Amino acid sequence: MELARYIDHTALKAETTKDQITTLCAEALEYKFASVCVNPTWVKYAAEQLKSDDDVKVCTVIGFPLGANTPEVKAFETKDAIANGADEVDMVINIAALKDADYDLVERDIRAVVEAANGTLVKVIFETCMLTKEEIKKAAELSVKAGADFVKTSTGFSTGGATVEDIRLMRETVGPDIGVKASGGVRDFEGAKAMIDAGATRIGASAGIAIVTGGRSDSDY
């Protein structure tokens, strides 16, 4: 298992500095991670830092971390991020709309980002710690219907992160052709392997180096 290629090497805290983004990108190049995941303000800089290796992508976040923006705002964010060099976007669904069973809005919200991305890879963040199993399943179904490429557990900014049980449910719901990303609380090799064994095809973590070197991080993301 080439574990590094599963990892989105992540730095999303508000206080993340330019020096920390520089280090993040250098580490991603060294370890050959799938991507760096950064806030939109750092996309252009990260793209410049990673231009020597087409295999290490720039991932950013949309409607993050609450998912409470309108579809139109999320679409604008998506276009702006791609113009700045983003290769992948991780959007947060409208969590309240899902809880209200306003499935038309949930789907329209996802589809707005998918259409704005125009072929750029889209991952849909559910914030599974806030959802029932039925809501997770419904979010996965709506993500597939709206044309998303991936479903993702968590922002890393709420009360819980990825669980093996949720990853398994998401994989069972979306089938074999959609990616599943585990994020939030994956801190070591054993945790990452458990997620992959349950069906994850990507791991979002700030602990990427610890994961691939057999160490452990205390980071929540």
Swiss-Prot record:
Protein transport keyword on record: no
Catalyzed reactions: 2-deoxy-D-ribose 5-phosphate = D-glyceraldehyde 3-phosphate + acetaldehyde
Keyword ATP-binding: no
Keyword annotations from UniProtKB, A to Z: Cytoplasm, Lyase, Schiff base
Name of one Pfam family that matches: DeoC
EC class (word): lyase
Enzyme Commission number, as recorded: 4.1.2.4
Places the protein is found: Cytoplasm
Annotated InterPro entries: Aldolase_TIM, DeoC, DeoC/FbaB/LacD_aldolase, DeoC_typeI
Main localization (coarse): cytoplasm
GO cellular component, one term: cytoplasm
Domain of life: Bacteria
Molecular functions per Gene Ontology: deoxyribose-phosphate aldolase activity
Catalytic machinery residues: D90 (proton donor/acceptor), K152 (schiff-base intermediate with acetaldehyde), K181 (proton donor/acceptor)
GO biological process: 2-deoxyribose 1-phosphate catabolic process; carbohydrate catabolic process; deoxyribonucleotide catabolic process
Pathway: Carbohydrate degradation; 2-deoxy-D-ribose 1-phosphate degradation; D-glyceraldehyde 3-phosphate and acetaldehyde from 2-deoxy-alpha-D-ribose 1-phosphate: step 2/2
Its job: Catalyzes a reversible aldol reaction between acetaldehyde and D-glyceraldehyde 3-phosphate to generate 2-deoxy-D-ribose 5-phosphate.
Family listed: Belongs to the DeoC/FbaB aldolase family. DeoC type 1 subfamily.
HAMAP family: DeoC_type1
Protein's UniProt name: Deoxyribose-phosphate aldolase
Lineage: Bacteria, Bacillati, Bacillota, Bacilli, Bacillales
